[in-house]
Swiss-Prot record:
GO terms for biological process: phenylalanyl-tRNA aminoacylation. Belongs to the class-II aminoacyl-tRNA synthetase family. Phe-tRNA synthetase alpha subunit type 1 subfamily. InterPro entries: aa-tRNA-synth_II, aa-tRNA-synth_II/BPL/LPL, Phe-tRNA-synth_IIc_asu, Phe-tRNA_ligase_II_N, Phe_tRNA_ligase_alpha1_bac, Phenylalanyl-tRNA_Synthase, tRNA-bd_arm. The gene is pheS. Keywords: Aminoacyl-tRNA synthetase, ATP-binding, Cytoplasm, Ligase, Magnesium, Metal-binding, Nucleotide-binding, Protein biosynthesis. Its EC number is 6.1.1.20. NCBIfam families: pheS. Tetramer of two alpha and two beta subunits. It comes from the Bacteria. It comes from Cronobacter sakazakii (strain ATCC BAA-894) (Enterobacter sakazakii). It catalyses: tRNA(Phe) + L-phenylalanine + ATP = L-phenylalanyl-tRNA(Phe) + AMP + diphosphate + H(+). It is found in: Cytoplasm. This is Phenylalanine--tRNA ligase alpha subunit.
Length: 327
């Protein structure tokens, strides 16, 4: 089939001349498509005697295979050339600075907790923790809070049943520590607490830090000196501070501590007092031998005062525009 050799030679020449994959595909269709030159050669077999058809078909298939191999080889060449051209056009300048990695930062409330733990750690306080699901004994009874106290009401406390609740303060940590450890005791107890309240200055969950010292000859003067030093260290100012008489069931005497704000108004920052003798008796400590003081403060409130934040809820909304200000 001399005409077949001419078709193969013509196909190979066209393949070599193709300058891109699209042109090469046109050659493939022209010679190997359904109506391609080589494909149509198969229709000529019917004109041959039956005994010659197998040999002639094999020759045609061999010709088609040669063209297909030439197509594959040329396609690889064209694709490789196109890739090299694209890589050359997209040369990376390795001297350019890379994409900047965004640095993370501590949440402002976490910053406050770390700062307070660092200060009291230098005074010999250790960090103590306890369960967030409490029983009414550790959350109320042991702290000299009677059954008729309003803090036990459903509208203030999240109750699971008649005796279990989400703790409303970290004071239960103090009770457990005093029951399991003999004086001298010097701890701070940070953690999440829960109260049924939600507005611009209250959230159902917030962070609290309580402190406790129990030892011989602990006085209110020790309490005042400790908190004076703490507040001036925390706010990094020589603040005007006042202790205002107050009432807490678990301390006697009790006080609330205010600092003078930049607007000339007093701002409440924490509550404190001398540990009530009944609380000491409840944990097996003799109030005739030992005394102590305790204090408690909201981490969000201190953070708001330190950074000038006006809405407590911003701490819980995870708005990066807000949080990035505290890096």
């Amino acid at each position: 089939m001399p005409h077949l050799a001419d078709l193969v030679a013509s196909a190979k020449a066209a393949i070599t001349s193709a300058q891109d994959v699209a042109a090469l595909d046109n050659v493939r269709v022209e010679y190997l498509g359904k109506k391609g030159h080589l494909t149509l050669q198969m229709t000529t077999l019917r004109e041959l005697p039956p005994e010659e058809r197998p040999a002639a078909g094999a020759v045609i298939n061999e010709a088609k295979e040669q063209v297909q191999q030439a197509l594959n080889a040329r396609k690889n060449e064209l694709e490789s050339a196109a890739l090299n051209a694209r890589l050359a056009a997209e040369t990376i300048d390795v001297s350019l600075p890379g994409r900047r990695v965004e640095n993370g930062g501590l949440h402002p409330v976490t910053r406050t907790i770390d700062r307070i733990e660092s200060f009291f750690g230098e005074l010999g306080f250790t960090v103590a923790t306890g369960p967030e699901i409490e029983d009414d004994y550790h959350n109320f009874d042991a702290l000299n809070i009677p059954g008729h106290h309003p803090a036990r009401a459903d509208h203030d406390t999240f109750w699971f049943d008649a005796t279990r609740l989400l703790r409303t303060q970290t004071s239960g940590v103090q009770i457990r520590t005093m029951k399991n450890q003999q004086p001298p005791i010097r701890i701070i107890a940070p953690g999440r607490v829960y109260r049924n309240d939600y507005d611009q200055t209250h959230t159902p969950m917030f962070h609290q830090m309580e402190g406790l010292i129990v030892d011989k000859n602990i006085s209110f003067t020790n309490l005042k000196g400790t908190l004076h030093d703490f507040l001036r260290n925390f706010f990094e100012e020589d603040l005007q501070i006042r202790f205002r008489p107050s009432y807490f069931p678990f301390t006697e005497p009790s006080a609330e501590v205010d600092v003078m704000g930049k607007n000339g108004k007093w701002l409440e920052v924490l509550g404190c007092g001398m540990v009530h003798p009944n609380v000491l008796r409840n944990v097996g400590i003799d109030p005739e031998v030992y005394s102590g003081f305790a204090f408690g403060m909201g981490m969000e409130r201190l953070t708001m005062l330190r950074y000038g934040v006006t809405d407590l809820r911003a701490f819980f909304e995870n708005d990066l525009r807000f949080l990035k200000q505290f890096k």
